[in-house]
Structures are given as C-alpha cells and as structure tokens.
Curated annotation (Swiss-Prot):
<keyword id="KW-0963">Cytoplasm</keyword>
<keyword id="KW-0641">Proline biosynthesis</keyword>
<comment type="pathway">
    <text>Amino-acid biosynthesis; L-proline biosynthesis; L-glutamate 5-semialdehyde from L-glutamate: step 1/2.</text>
</comment>
<keyword id="KW-0547">Nucleotide-binding</keyword>
<dbReference type="InterPro" id="IPR005715">
    <property type="entry name" value="Glu_5kinase/COase_Synthase"/>
</dbReference>
<keyword id="KW-0808">Transferase</keyword>
<dbReference type="InterPro" id="IPR041739">
    <property type="entry name" value="G5K_ProB"/>
</dbReference>
<dbReference type="InterPro" id="IPR001048">
    <property type="entry name" value="Asp/Glu/Uridylate_kinase"/>
</dbReference>
<dbReference type="GO" id="GO:0004349">
    <property type="term" value="F:glutamate 5-kinase activity"/>
</dbReference>
<keyword id="KW-0418">Kinase</keyword>
<dbReference type="InterPro" id="IPR011529">
    <property type="entry name" value="Glu_5kinase"/>
</dbReference>
<feature type="binding site">
    <location>
        <begin position="214"/>
        <end position="220"/>
    </location>
    <ligand>
        <name>ATP</name>
    </ligand>
</feature>
<dbReference type="InterPro" id="IPR019797">
    <property type="entry name" value="Glutamate_5-kinase_CS"/>
</dbReference>
<dbReference type="GO" id="GO:0005829">
    <property type="term" value="C:cytosol"/>
</dbReference>
<dbReference type="GO" id="GO:0055129">
    <property type="term" value="P:L-proline biosynthetic process"/>
</dbReference>
<comment type="function">
    <text>Catalyzes the transfer of a phosphate group to glutamate to form L-glutamate 5-phosphate.</text>
</comment>
<feature type="binding site">
    <location>
        <position position="141"/>
    </location>
    <ligand>
        <name>substrate</name>
    </ligand>
</feature>
Length: 262
C-alpha cells in the first residue's frame, strides 16, 4: 500500500496547532515556511493539494499576549477572529514566493451536512483546484458555537477528503504516529507502521490534545475511520520532520498508515 501513495494525485494535508505555533501560541514561522515549501514542491509535481490548517486561535492568543487558551466560547471565537487573518496573511506571503495563489475556505458543520451547501462547498474547491489555487481550509470558529462545531480539524480534514474524493489524507502532528503504548511513559517505542481503521484502536488512543489545540489521538483515529468509509488512506506523521511530505509520497515508511489494505 505504501508504494501506491506515490501515485496519489489529490492530497489533503492537515497541520495541527502544536506544529504551527510555539508553546506560547505565536506562529512558528520556520515550520510554516518548511510546510509551504513542501506543498509547493508537490504542486509543481502535478499534485492537487488542499491544506486544512489549525492555528487561528493559537495565533490570536500569541498576538494578544495571552498566556492561556480561555475556556469561554466567546473568547475563543474572538481569538479566532484575530488569528485567522494573521494565519492567512502568513500563508499568502509564503506561497506567493513560489508564484502560488491561495484561497481561504472557512467551513461550518452545515456546509458539510446540508446537501445543497455541501455541493456548493465541493464546487468551490473543485474550481479553486482547477485554477491551480491552493485551498486553505479551517473551521469558521468565529461564528460556530460549541454545539454546532464540526469538532476539530482532524475530523474536518477527513470530511473534506470525503467531500472532494481525495486520494490521501495526511495528518501532521507533534507525534510520529500511533504507538502501542504512551511513548512518554515508554521511551524507545516505535510507531505502528500500519493499522486498519476497523481494528480496536481505542486502547491506543488515550490522552487529550495539546494545550493550544482541540485534537488528540482519539480524533485522529476517528478521522481515519471516516476516511476508510470512503476508501481513502490516511497517514499520521510528525510535522516537525524535515521533508515529511515528500517522504510519505515517495512511499517511505514514515508515521502510521491507516488503511484497510496493508
């Protein structure tokens, strides 16, 4: 199955808050630059790439000099309003260095569940890809309450992958993959190279996400299962690894491959 990843044309890449920001919440420009360079390389290879990005709330946190992510919904929505603009400004500047244009796509749960809005969202992204634009997707946190959220960007990226009939979803996080036990408690463990989303993975998926994010291994396993329902493989890998996207799409055994075929 790894060898088949070399031929994936339409790829969804999700990058998490822990990869995009420093612990204090400020954007990690070095990692953003490395990510954009890799995506540009994939684009010029002839692949279609959609980026699902976290980091809006974290960027707002850093810009306003706040020490902790607030629990209040309105405060998080306000932080997203500040941070989303900062995030897109950075992406626009970085991609423009490669002559690439980006398009912001902010989605809500209704955009993915209502048939008419779902069809409209798919048409917009198809048009952007046809024009050679890099769609940059995030949940519209500013107008979305906790009760009607998609939930997290792992789930969002899987739903986007299904929406546009992607060939592959890559989740970039602060972990190297799915481990058989907590690697913090068991140093020296290697990630599991391949698992089926149909397996009992919940025992491997304990633990919350990072302090500035909303995800964790539970949401990544859930994303893999959404992808599996649509025949889409998913790879979970560390976003801090140099050239991680090139290595995955070269068929190298990087991270954990979630697929019904080994």
């Amino acid at each position: 199955m790894r060898e088949r990843l070399r031929h994936c044309k339409r790829v969804i890449i999700k990058v998490g808050t822990s990869t995009l920001t420093h612990p204090g919440g400020h954007l990690h420009l070095g990692r953003m630059e490395a990510l954009v360079r890799q995506i540009a390389d994939l684009h010029f290879e002839g692949r279609q790439v959609i980026l699902v990005t976290s980091g809006a709330v974290g960027a707002g946190l850093g810009r306003l000099g706040l020490a902790e992510r607030p629990a209040e919904v309105a405060a998080k929505q306000a932080l997203a309003a500040v941070g989303q603009g900062l995030l897109m400004q950075r992406y626009e500047g970085l991609f423009s260095e490669y002559g690439l244009v980006v398009g912001q796509v902010l989605l809500t749960r209704e955009d993915l569940e209502d048939p008419d809005r779902r069809a409209s969202s798919a048409q917009v992204m198809e048009r952007l890809l046809a024009w050679g634009v890099i769609p940059i997707v995030n949940e519209n946190d500013t107008v979305t309450s906790e009760e009607i959220r998609v939930g997290d960007n792992d789930t969002l990226s899987a739903r986007v992958a299904a929406l546009v009939r992607a060939d592959l979803l890559i989740l970039l996080s602060d972990v190297d993959g799915l481990y058989p036990a907590d690697p913090h408690l068991h140093p020296g463990l290697s990630p599991i190279p391949w698992v089926s989303p149909d397996d009992d993975l919940d025992r491997f998926a304990g633990g919350p996400g990072s302090a500035n994010g909303t995800g964790g291994m539970v949401t990544k396993v859930a994303a893999a299962r959404i992808c599996a329902e649509h025949g889409i493989p998913m790879v979970l890998a560390c976003g801090e690894r140099p050239d991680v996207l090139r290595q995955i799409l070269a068929g190298e055994e990087i991270g954990t491959l979630f697929s019904r075929e080994g």
